[in-house]
């Protein structure tokens, strides 16, 4: 954390954010928007590889893996400084009751969920009403966000310049497909 804090240059990051703000507020006048960090900042520390499956049950490993992304961004000229609770596309479907599907560690791929067993299972899900947002992966997502905020609060530049953005929640049709399975598309045709 100290090393990342020392590598963040407020002048450089303010300029980088200004470029994004200009684009957002229609002040960009070029042909193709491609923000550039004026100066890269290389890490001097060794890195430990973190496997995705390791991060799923270990908040410290999740934080470390996300900070590796921040370190990489500081070494690039165009990446935003950001972290997220990185639990894959099955976050909301797990909150709704779908079983988590974790691939073997060798795949180093984010988890997803298995579909429920047909239309009847979907109907029972709807009858149960609103689930708790801490069901499934929900509690891990909230815990990761809380840890990020707690740790970042001790580092003023990290707190200011490293954005905590929302996890991969997917859209409504994606969630329906995760819950129903590929039969969803045939069911839509036969309605």
Language-model-detected regions and their locations in the chain:
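Metal- and O2-centered redox machinery and metal/ROS homeostasis
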Residues: 4, 135-138, 150, 174-179
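Hydrophobic faces of well-ordered beta-strands that scaffold small-molecule active sites
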Residues: 79-85, 160-168
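A short mid-domain helix/strand-loop element embedded in enzyme catalytic domains
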Residues: 164-186
């Amino acid at each position: 954390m100290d090393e990342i804090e020392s590598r963040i240059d407020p002048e450089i990051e303010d300029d980088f954010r200004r470029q994004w703000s200009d684009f957002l507020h229609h002040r960009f006048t070029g042909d193709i928007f491609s923000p550039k960090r004026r100066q890269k900042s290389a890490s001097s520390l060794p890195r430990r590889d973190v496997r995705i499956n390791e991060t799923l049950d270990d908040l410290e490993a999740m934080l470390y893996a996300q900070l590796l992304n921040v370190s990489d961004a500081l070494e690039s000229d165009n990446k935003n400084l950001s972290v997220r609770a990185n639990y894959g596309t099955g976050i909301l479907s797990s909150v709704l009751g779908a079983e988590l599907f974790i691939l073997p560690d060798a795949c180093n791929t984010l988890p997803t969920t298995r579909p429920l067993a047909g239309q009847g299972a979907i109907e029972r899900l709807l009858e149960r009403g609103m689930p708790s947002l801490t069901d499934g992966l929900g509690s891990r997502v909230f815990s990761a966000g809380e840890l990020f905020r707690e740790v970042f609060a001790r580092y003023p530049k990290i707190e200011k310049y490293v954005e905590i953005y929302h996890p991969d929640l997917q859209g409504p049709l994606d969630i329906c497909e995760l819950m129903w399975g590929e039969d969803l598309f045939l069911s839509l045709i036969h309605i």
